[in-house]
């Protein structure tokens, strides 16, 4: 029986960046890795209602820099920045080094696999029919420019006695193409009948040039020299 590799893991260093970008010697590596895990666990719990897409961590010069990608930055920042200051102090206490918190806004949450999966999970917990929730998510993603999307839900769908899986796809989702920019994530819906798992794959297009093309900002076309007006001869 064929199994699917994680779409992010197989594309690391090709078209997908790492979630933690730091180097450490042998003595510090385990502590840093454990610190990253605890920081992410704390932030995901504290910001459960803030539509957090992903958390990236850097460790420059005995400090930690955390970037929170969210569709609702106002909730994370809080009134006059009070909430983000509390988060900074908590992260510094967990990591044991000075912390810096950056907030990055997700412009199109309908094209983010994590936010789409969380949205479907919240709808299922509110007893929305699973087919309606899946179809709505697919239509919104395609309307905003996705090349393809696939949504799969598994569990006691509709309160059925026997668990099953159903999926809905629109467009292309080329999992074997390594240059394809595929966003993948999962979520869980805790219903009265049990846990329903949600998986979302979103194909945003192909990236030619690999990580170098992602790192470089788009170059603006150079202004062409203006031509002299016709019909005027030399004096």
Curated annotation (Swiss-Prot):
InterPro entries: KH_dom, KH_dom-like_a/b, KH_dom_type_2, KH_sf_prok-type, Ribosomal_S3_C_sf, Ribosomal_uS3_bac-typ, Ribosomal_uS3_C, Ribosomal_uS3_CS. Residues 215-235 are annotated as: Disordered. GO terms for cellular component: cytosolic small ribosomal subunit. The keyword Thylakoid does not apply. Pfam families: KH_2, Ribosomal_S3_C. GO terms for molecular function: mRNA binding; rRNA binding; structural constituent of ribosome. GO terms for biological process: translation. Residues 39-107 form the KH type-2 domain. The keyword Ribonucleoprotein applies. Keywords: Ribonucleoprotein, Ribosomal protein, RNA-binding, rRNA-binding. It comes from the Bacteria. Binds the lower part of the 30S subunit head. Binds mRNA in the 70S ribosome, positioning it for translation. Part of the 30S ribosomal subunit. Forms a tight complex with proteins S10 and S14. PANTHER family: 30S/40S RIBOSOMAL PROTEIN S3, SMALL RIBOSOMAL SUBUNIT PROTEIN US3C. Belongs to the universal ribosomal protein uS3 family. This is Small ribosomal subunit protein uS3.
């Amino acid at each position: 029986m064929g199994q699917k590799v994680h779409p992010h893991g197989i594309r690391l260093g090709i078209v997908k960046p790492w979630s933690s970008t730091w180097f450490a010697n042998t003595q510090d590596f385990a502590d840093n890795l454990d610190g990253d895990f605890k920081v992410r666990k704390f932030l995901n719990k504290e910001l459960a209602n803030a539509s957090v897409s992903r958390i990236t961590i850097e460790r420059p010069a005995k400090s930690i820099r955390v970037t929170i990608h969210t569709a609702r930055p106002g909730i994370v920042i809080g009134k006059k920045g009070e909430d983000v200051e509390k988060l900074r102090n908590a992260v510094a206490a967990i990591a044991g080094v000075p912390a810096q918190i950056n907030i990055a806004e997700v412009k199109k949450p309908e094209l983010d696999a994590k936010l789409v999966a969380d949205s479907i999970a919240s709808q299922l917990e509110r007893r929305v029919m699973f087919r309606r929730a899946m179809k709505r998510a697919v239509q919104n993603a395609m309307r905003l420019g996705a090349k393809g999307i696939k949504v799969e839900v598994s569990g006691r769908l509709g309160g059925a006695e026997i668990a099953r899986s159903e999926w809905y796809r629109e467009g292309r989702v080329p999992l074997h193409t390594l240059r394809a920019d595929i966003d993948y994530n999962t979520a869980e819906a805790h219903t009265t009948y049990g846990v329903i798992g949600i998986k979302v794959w979103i194909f945003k297009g192909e990236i030619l040039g690999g990580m170098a093309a992602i790192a470089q900002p788009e170059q603006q076309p150079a202004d062409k020299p203006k031509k002299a007006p016709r019909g005027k001869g030399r004096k």
